[in-house]
Amino acid sequence: MKRVSGRALTVSLLMMIVSLTSSTSLAADFKREVIYQIITDRFFDGNGTNNNPAQSSGLYDGSRANWRAYWGGDLQGIQAKMSYLAGMGVTAIWISPPVDNLNLNIPDGNGNPTASYHGYQGRDFKKVEEHSGDASNAWTAFDNLVAAAHSSGIKVIVDFAPNHSTQDNAGEFGAIYDNGTFLGNFTADSNGYFHHNGNIMDWNDRYQVQYYTLFNLADINQEHATMDAYMKAAAQLFQQHGVDGFRVDAVKHVTWGWQYSLANSVYTFGDSFLFGEWYQGNTSDPLFSDSYRFANKSGISLLDFPLNTAIRNVFGSANANFGDIDTALTQVNARFTWKDDLVTFIDNHDMARFLSINNNNDRLHQALAFTLTCRGIPCIYYGTEQYLHDDTDGGGDPYNRPQMVNFSTSTTAYNLTKKLSDLRKSNTALGYGSMTQRWMNSDVYIYERKFYNSVVLVAINKSSSTAYPISGLFTSLPAGVYSNYLAGVLSGPSITVGAGSGGNNPVTNFSLPANSVAVWQFVEAAGTTPQIGSTGPTVGQPGIKVTVAGRNFGSTAGTVKFGTTAASVISWSDTKIVAAVPAVANGNQSITVTRGAQVSNAIQFTVLQEKLIPVTFTVNNATPTVMGDYIFLTGNTVELGNWNTTWDGATGPMNAPTYPNWFLNVSVPAGKVIQFKFIKIAANGAVTWEAGSNHTYTVPASGVGFVNVNWQY
């Protein structure tokens, strides 16, 4: 996130319809994509008439001397460069928040104008920013971009920031609008649309990170019925305009429980992919366990910050070794159920660009090759392929957002991205496969991706001077001679693989040159046994559509089962099936595909009872706790943990800003009568149940809900 006429209408509607019907339609399956992150204002000026619009005049600097002003990039500019993006192998673009942003200048400490060029101070989430589109805040430019992207085989992800509106102490004072109608602002908040708790002081406090203010940005109260409906309607509006996914800004700071219902609302409306920004340095972060529990259960994947830290350390420093990356992968993979949906990256708009911390193109190429071949969904920050960076003040905000000035298609980084993007399309090992470290020292990392018998083996030597002899290497590649897939782009040797057993075939000793990256690969021939590589979403209620992706499904429809119950098949192809979740018991079910007599592997899917409603549960005068003890909620539905009493299984921990009263927002099934109780989980794991009968509550059919009970002694 950012720190601090009739004919025209007809054309717009036509473009929107085209974008919806010609969408790449595998939006729920992103595992084989290459995402390209764009700060719209800094990419390309495709329409000079929107640079200084009347309703927000004076915020544009054509000289580009003021780094906190608008510089002219717009949606038309991205559309104009669609062939450039497609030529690089980009299959999805993540654009900065396109919603109508702050209209007023808030001078910096030196009196210089500042603007919300980055998009993270939304004032109207149902209109398009005039600097990005046109003076009427219409959707025309956005619809045209989506249509152009889809016709180029590129998906569109919008950055969505439901945590806050605009600055709360200046400018428009957090004012928020609903398609032009004023709803309220932070300073005159009689409706309670905002939280008023001051700025976050303790970044490891669960209550503060969700309910306090992020850098003076008016913190929205998503538990308010109006704000809940508003944000979900805004997301659905983007879906109506053809977007394929959402990058949810600052998920660590938006009410965690409410976001389950946001994701469910999106998935109920249509095919999509969601991932969020949960900033953390590494797996020792105090809230790391909260991050993986959120990702495992909410339906929202995350940006892989722990791996990002390791990538920047290993490739950005002369002293760090590949053990950092190997450890990060091991620790993250052990905790995240859907690790292949994590979005991997080298840098982004909130940190110095890689070349600002290590101005070495060889190291950048190695980091790029690693990101494009390791587990997860790779995301490339705009300009990386052109070696774009500005090192002023260390290259941090705003100097990590320079103007894109070159669009060369001949750079090594551009062609490396293209080459490995093509491999992600042709070899399922990169999108769906396991990842195994095969050989490692401080400078060399050799790892293998494998999906059934399709294999990709990658070797990286980051030493600038030492060639390493590689002996004792084993691989799942079949016996044979393999040339470097990256030949002509990056240097690397061929290898010879002998016959072994158990997926451990010996590689003849070879030398891995300094500053080299080599990729060797094998694609298994098509067969008749279905192979599931992905399902999306991973959680939902009966009736919701689920995309099952993989290979060998055949051209004739077979059977998709959730547990032992057959699902209604909506569409079927050899690599993709869309089916509706059948009426089965809530909880984890195994999805399988049957083709003739052949049955696929199974992938887990969490079945909910109904669409989700955010409900705030409060328990008063709970049993006393000491440091390390927490109150949790558990109950008779999968959403409440099915009476689980562990940290990872129960729902919580709850928040206690007015101890001994505790509260927690949880998304639960609409219209259902649920049973629940509160428990204390002590620091040593001991569980204390409240006494008495189970509490019962009838969840509203829509909107939001509130429960307020006393602890039963």
Task: Give the ranges of each region predicted by the language model.
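Substrate-binding/active-site clefts of carbohydrate-active enzymes
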Residues: 27-34, 39-241, 257-291, 298, ...
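Active-site-proximal helices and loops of the catalytic beta/alpha 8
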Residues: 145-154, 164, 232-338, 342, ...
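Short proline/glycine-enriched turn/loop motifs at strand-loop junctions of beta-rich domains
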Residues: 475-480, 551-557, 625-629, 636-637, ...
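Structured interaction patches on ligand/partner-binding surfaces of diverse proteins
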Residues: 496-511, 681-713
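Aromatic-rich carbohydrate-binding modules that target alpha-glucans
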Residues: 623-673, 681-700
